[in-house]
Amino acid sequence: MTVNTPANPDILALGEAMIEFNQSAKGEPKYLQGFGGDTSNFCIAAARQGARTGFVSAVGADHFGRLLIDLWERENVDTAQVRVDPQASTGVYFVSHGPDGHAFDYLRAGSAASRYAPHDLPLDAIAAAKVIHLSGISLAISLSACDAALEAIAHARANGVRVSFDTNLRLKLWPLNRARAVMLEAIRQTDICLPSWDDVTELTGLTGRDEIVDFLLSHGPRVVALKLGKDGSYIATPDERRVVPGHVVNAVDATGAGDCFGGAFIARLVEGDDPFEAARYANVAAALSTQGYGAVAPVPSRAAVEEILAG
C-alpha cells in the first residue's frame, strides 16, 4: 500500500518510525501516545520548514502502522516508499523522565522496519532526490537494514545525491566496536555529518571540539554540524568553522531535538542557505521543539522559527 505521492521529494530519509509513549511528568504513571523514530522525526521537521520530504521504510499491517501513515499524510511527507509488511509489527518505545534526564525503552525486535532489505530500496526515488538522510539507528536495527542503508548511500553518491548522516549512537542496539566500524564506513561516504557531542566523543574517543571535527572532515564529509544542545552547534567546513550560539528557552523535554535540528538544517541547505545560516535557523527550531513533550508534536513551523529570527 502506498499513499500520499506529491512531486518527487527533495529530501528522503531512510530508517525506522515508531509509536512513542512519553511519560507525562517525572514519577507519573501516565504516558502520552505520540510518534518517534529519528529519521521520521527528521522528515517531519524538514517538512514543517517547507521542504518536500519523503520517508523510506516499512511499517506493520497494524493499527500503529496506520497511525504513522496518517501522521505522514497530515505532515505532507511523501509515503510512496513506505511498505506495509503484513508479517511484522510496528515498533514501539517508551520515554521516562528522571533526575538524570530522559531514558528510552524499546519494543522493536522483528519490527517491519528491521526486516527492510536492499531489494526493498526505491532506487529511482533515491536517484531523483537532492539529499538522502540516514542515521546510526538506520544502520543498527538489523543486518538487512544496515545493508540496505549502505546500499542506499552508495546509490545516492553514484547519482550525485548528497548524503546526510546523523550518528545517533544507541548502544542498546549494537556493541560499540561494531558501531564504530560501520558508522565510519558510512561517514566516509557522507557529505553532511550531524553528530551530537555525546555520540561523537563515545565513537571517536576524542574530547576536543576541533580534533573531533578534524577527524570527521578527514573521513570525507564537507560539512560537519556538531550539535551542542542548549549551547548551539559547532559548524565546520574545510575552509571555516565557528560556534553558532543556541536559542535560550525554558525546555521541558529534549526528546527529538537533535532530529529537529537535522531536519531544519538540511531543509535550509536545500533552500540555499550556507551551513552557518542553516545552523542559526536550526538552532532556533531545535530549541523551540523542547518546549513541549514528545518528538513530533512540539516541532515548530517555519513561521514560528522565522518570527524568532526576525525579533
State what each model feature region is.
Residues 10, 52, 162, 192, ...:
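Proline-centered loop/turn at the N-terminus of a beta-strand
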Residues 1-78, 250-252:
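Glycine-rich phosphate/adenosyl-contacting loop at the front of the ribokinase-like
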Residues 52-136, 307-311:
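Conserved N-terminal subdomain of the carbohydrate kinase-like
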Residues 46, 196, 258:
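Short, conserved phosphate/pyrophosphate- and ester-handling motifs at nucleotide-, phospho-/glycolipid
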Residues 131, 137-214, 231-233:
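Conserved beta-alpha-beta core of the PfkB/ribokinase-like small-molecule kinase fold
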Residues 1-12, 154-158, 205, 209-311:
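Conserved phosphate-binding/catalytic region of the ribokinase-like
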